[in-house]
Amino acid sequence: MTTLTGKTVLLTGASRGLGVYIARALAKEQATVVCVSRSQSGLAQTCNAVKAAGGKAIAIPFDVRNTSQLSALVQQAQDIVGPIDVLINNAGIEINGTFANYSLAEIQSIFNTNLLAAMELTRLLLPSMMERGSGRIVNIASLAGKKGVAFNSVYSASKAGLIMWTDAMRQELVGTGVNISVVCPGYVSQTGMTVDTRVSAPKLAGISTPKSVANAVVKAIKNKTTEVIVNQNPITESLTKLMLAVGQISPTSVDRIYRWFGVVDFNQKRAENRVKDGYVAVESHRS
């Protein structure tokens, strides 16, 4: 799929954060974007942005945490636009905290949004893609899924699951004409975790722009890229890959690097702020 012109894309988490930037990037490629999110007002704004950028947009308000109802979402989308060429699983939720303080409902909410919704949407759309011998699936994960992050353990686990599932599916789909990719951004400016003005994201760890992440998604679709690390610039990305490789040999060495970068302190402060806020869920860069 060297071009997205005339292709139909189903994008979850489209109402804010990264979702808006991804939708705009797709619009510039002349794609039709089926925008899915819980926020009807946010979807309207995203659809307007898509149309302004030269694309076509359809809004479908839906909470992807309701995984048992996702078949209705897929049917509604296909009734409106026909076959889906590209699925982008971007919806995500993040709740910082010490693990002992998580409720089962919070854990289930994170996994339903970050992992199970992606699996179920893929399961529902994959047969038609395989029948046509063409399709793209892009999962938006996180560097937190490549290296566990203290005080964000459930989010890390959900994203690690997304990465490993993508890896397994990539092997399973060889020869089908359907390709699956995973994009792993680090901290992203102007979105989710970085908008808490009470604590600044650790600059030493690298901070990317949402536009750069959106561009990486488009490139992954066009180039069939297996895995994309997005972290500020090519040099920082190369160092990140090296650090992750070292972590496979000596995990505690990278633990110390994370503490030195300020990653652990950052997440601990966000967890403390969550307690002060009365345990309100802090959604990540897409919802």
UniProtKB/Swiss-Prot annotation:
Transmembrane ranges?
none
InterPro entries reported for this sequence? NAD(P)-bd_dom_sf, Sc_DH/Rdtase_CS, SDR_fam
Task: Kindly report, in one word, the top-level EC class recorded for this enzyme.
Answer: oxidoreductase
A GO cellular component annotated for this chain's UniProt record is: membrane
Q: Which GO terms describe its biological process?
A: heterocyst development
Q: Where is the active site?
A: Y155
The positions annotated for binding substrate are S142
Pfam families under this entry? adh_short
- Superkingdom to which the source organism belongs: Bacteria
Keywords of the record, alphabetical order, are:
Heterocyst, Oxidoreductase
Positions the record marks as coiled coil are: none
**Positions contributing to NAD(+) binding:** 11-35
In short, the EC number is: 1.3.1.-
Q: Name one GO molecular function term.
A: oxidoreductase activity
Classification via SUPFAM superfamilies: NAD(P)-binding Rossmann-fold domains
Family per similarity comment: Belongs to the short-chain dehydrogenases/reductases (SDR) family.
Q: What is this protein's function per UniProt? A: May be involved in repressing heterocyst differentiation and may be essential for preventing all vegetative cells from differentiating.
For this entry, the protein name equals Ketoacyl reductase HetN
Source organism per entry reads Nostoc sp. (strain PCC 7120 / SAG 25.82 / UTEX 2576)
The gene that this protein is the product of is: hetN
